[in-house]
């Protein structure tokens, strides 16, 4: 029997760059709300035992309704987000089952995640304690100064575009949260919390299709990918 894994779906962010009033988690993709695809992937992964969704207060009932309408029975709680990503995840952590041994933390606005990718990164975390999906970088990346002048060029072979889910052994992640202190608001992903305390994280091969809905062009790309999977 596998360890108890709680998925924490972070869906509390706004949609300023989308230029829409609604939460981007509800953007229709082939006439279905984006978060529906996200929730279904975790529902269908046998390694995931429960799903906790972190959202804005005004979105909570809508998310519950989507779960009920689609038979997504693993959703155990829908809780309010915080002032930062880390605080939102902490709220999710506090709502998980006490039996949880691992947290699989995922962006609600990454609806193209697959069951196979979830399984791959969770199984890696079983072995190492901390793992994330990531893809190789194809563009040349430059480090610039405050005046937008190039300072250096990191080796592309050492760069990864990190995705979610990011999966951590529960005690490790809770310890990292406790040690984040006042810097919590500066963390844009959960791996950064572990990095901050010197922890090691395995990067598992991800898929470039696992995009995050950020700008309007992402909607077109996401729908094209979904059509290709039919």
Q: PLM features: residue spans?
A:
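N-terminal glycine-rich phosphate-binding loop and ensuing alpha1 helix
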Residues: 2-60
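Hydrophobic packing residues within well-ordered alpha-helices of enzyme cores
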Residues: 18, 63-64, 121, 141, ...
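Short aromatic/basic micro-patch
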Residues: 28, 112, 167, 212-213
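Hydrophobic helical membrane-anchoring modules
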Residues: 210-230
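Residue-level signal for inorganic ion chemistry
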Residues: 9, 35, 92, 106-107, ...
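Short aromatic/hydrophobic "clamp" motif used to bind/position activated sugar donors
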Residues: 102-104
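Conserved N-terminal catalytic core of the sugar/cofactor nucleotidyltransferase
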Residues: 36-99, 180-183
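Conserved core of the sugar-phosphate nucleotidyltransferase
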Residues: 112-204
């Amino acid at each position: 029997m596998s360890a108890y894994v709680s998925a924490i779906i972070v869906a509390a962010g706004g949609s300023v760059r989308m230029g829409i009033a609604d939460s981007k988690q509800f953007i229709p993709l082939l006439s279905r709300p984006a978060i529906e695809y996200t929730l279904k992937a975790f529902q269908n992964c046998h390694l995931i035992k429960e799903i906790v969704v972190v959202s804005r207060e005004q979105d909570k009932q809508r998310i519950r309704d989507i779960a009920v309408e689609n038979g997504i029975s693993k959703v155990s709680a829908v809780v309010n987000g915080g002032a930062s990503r880390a605080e939102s995840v902490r709220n999710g952590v506090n709502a998980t089952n006490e039996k949880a041994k691992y947290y699989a933390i995922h962006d609600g606005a990454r609806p193209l995640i697959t069951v196979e990718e979830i399984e791959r990164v969770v199984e890696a975390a079983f072995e190492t304690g901390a793992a994330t999906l990531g893809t190789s970088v194809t563009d040349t990346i430059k480090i610039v100064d405050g005046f937008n002048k190039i300072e250096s060029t990191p080796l592309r072979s050492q760069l990864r575009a990190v995705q979610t889910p990011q999966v951590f052994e529960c005690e490790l992640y809770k310890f990292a949260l406790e040690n984040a202190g006042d810097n919590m608001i500066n963390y844009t992903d959960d791996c950064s919390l572990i990095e901050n305390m010197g922890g090691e994280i395995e990067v598992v091969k991800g898929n470039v299709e696992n995009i995050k809905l950020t700008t309007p062009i992402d909607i077109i790309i996401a729908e094209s990918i979904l059509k290709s999977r039919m």
